[in-house]
Amino acid sequence: MDEDIQQEVQNLRDLIHKHEGTTARYLTERRRALNRLNKLGLPWPMIGREIGITTQTAMRWAGKWSRLRR
């Protein structure tokens, strides 16, 4: 894995672990970090595996998969 990608993965792990700041800011930072990783070329299943969540959860957190609201 590329050094840039490893650094981004570590930053995302730290962000999720700390969960500091307001909820809205945390969600925005988490979404941006996930999308940055995907833009660097890491596929969604691998992103999920690296941070310990499912592919669907990673995509939902990144805003790529919205839940149905009824």
Regions found by a protein language model. Name each.
Residues 1-22:
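N-terminal acidic leader/helix
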Residues 3-7, 42, 53:
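Short coil/turn linker and secondary-structure boundary residues
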Residues 25-42:
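Short, amphipathic alpha-helical "recognition" segments used to contact nucleic acids or chromatin
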Residues 30, 38, 51, 62-66:
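DNA major-groove recognition helix of helix-turn-helix
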Residues 44, 59-70:
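Short, solvent-exposed alpha-helical "recognition" segments
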Residues 47-49:
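Short alpha-helical "recognition helix" segments of helix-turn-helix
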Residues 56:
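Key DNA-contact positions within bacterial/archaeal DNA-binding proteins
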